[in-house]
């Protein structure tokens, strides 16, 4: 049995556990207790099986496959959805991830996971409620488009979304990333990692927080960040002392961050100049040692950050994240987290297949590559058969 298959079966077992059912009820003991046309497990399966069709067609196709001769109305279905804890799939994908990293088959770079933090605006149905709750990034004098600010931490080598939070469209990305990094050990345990961030994330307190916690990072600086120190660089890879003078502490005066900055007096950052493909010269700040990671490796690691951009594109275009089944905030969160779960599930299966193919093609000069787009399409069509199959032997064949 493939590793990913085993994890899918573990997910199904979790979905049917009393503990998970209680979590899905959000504290209401009466939810999902009566036998209905759409019990909890079917409710979860319909969300995993979304294909971007109208809700009426989605329900018709699912019921035809799972319960031939039985139908459910759109209002009846949405009534059941409104009872479901919006964090149900958040809990489920983190459970799947914990099992993934408990395995020894994941990829690392010099024994480190390579993680990227980034945010993306998600277009959601525009209603008075969603505008009030999440806001809009639309320009003045234009029709407002409600948006959720989705912030994620992504494992770029294993293509897994580790952390995700739905926020107002305008949110503090660094503050969120720090909260998410506090939770990451719950998923990966004590596996060391390097976090990569783009401009907009860095701040002196953030660097201090990460260094105090021994978190390794690579962050792209704006030209205005530590401008004096950047202008004084004489080498393309240089260790720089950042003096924490009054001008840098002033903004944090009277806060724990300000007190910590006064206590330290200065911090050391390694600044690395890199040339981007568009010809612009950028400066990266890192606490990785020069002996362990040379200049070209820092550049290589930073470019790996692009994987999170690809992940957002996959969520939006391949998995149709922005094609929501309703307008209520609880339905939006359910759709977002179920899509992230499906994305991680797809990548787990694809990675398994890639490893299997690598073993078969080990002696070939030209190795075959897995087409991710085709693979996700096949998975979306076939996954429901695995979920609905109750015979273990038939599941293994699927």
Segments (PLM) and residue ranges:
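Short, charged amphipathic recognition helices of the HTH superfamily
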Residues: 52-66
């Amino acid at each position: 049995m493939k590793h990913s298959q085993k994890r899918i079966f573990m997910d199904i077992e979790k979905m049917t556990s009393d503990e998970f059912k209680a979590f899905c009820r959000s504290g209401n003991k009466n939810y999902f207790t009566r036998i209905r046309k759409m019990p909890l497990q079917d409710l979860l399966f319909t969300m995993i099986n979304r294909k971007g069709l109208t809700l009426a067609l989605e329900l018709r196709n699912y019921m035809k496959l799972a319960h031939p001769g039985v139908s459910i109305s759109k209002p009846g279905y949405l009534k059941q959805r409104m009872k479901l804890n919006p964090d149900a799939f958040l809990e489920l994908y983190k459970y799947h991830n914990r099992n993934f990293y408990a395995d020894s088959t994941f990829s690392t770079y010099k024994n480190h996971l390579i993680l990227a933090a980034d945010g993306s605006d998600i277009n959601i149905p525009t209603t008075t409620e969603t505008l009030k709750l999440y806001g809009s990034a639309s320009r003045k004098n234009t029709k407002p488009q409600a948006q959720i600010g989705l912030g994620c931490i992504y494992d770029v080598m294993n293509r897994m979304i580790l952390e995700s939070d739905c926020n107002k469209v305008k949110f503090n990305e660094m503050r969120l990333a720090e909260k998410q990094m506090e939770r990451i050990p719950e998923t990966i345990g004590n596996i060391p990692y390097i976090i990569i961030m783009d401009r907009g994330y860095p701040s002196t307190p953030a660097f201090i927080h990460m260094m105090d916690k021994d978190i390794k990072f690579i962050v792209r600086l704006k030209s205005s960040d530590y401008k004096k120190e950047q202008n004084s660089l004489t080498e393309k890879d240089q260790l720089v002392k950042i003096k924490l003078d009054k001008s840098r502490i002033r903004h944090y005066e009277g806060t724990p961050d300000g007190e910590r900055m006064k206590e330290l007096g200065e911090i050391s950052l390694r600044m690395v100049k890199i040339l981007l493909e568009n010809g612009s010269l950028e400066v990266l700040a890192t606490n990785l040692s020069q002996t362990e990671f040379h200049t070209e490796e820092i550049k290589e690691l930073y470019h790996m950050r692009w994987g999170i951009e690809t992940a957002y594109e996959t969520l939006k275009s391949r998995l149709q994240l922005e094609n929501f089944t309703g307008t209520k905030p609880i339905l939006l969160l359910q759709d977002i987290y179920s899509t992230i779960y499906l994305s991680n599930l797809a990548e787990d299966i694809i990675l398994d297949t890639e490893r299997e193919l690598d073993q078969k093609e080990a002696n070939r000069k030209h190795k075959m590559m897995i087409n991710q787009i085709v693979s996700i399409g096949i998975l979306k069509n076939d996954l429901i058969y695995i979920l609905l199959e109750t015979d273990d032997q038939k599941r293994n064949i699927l």
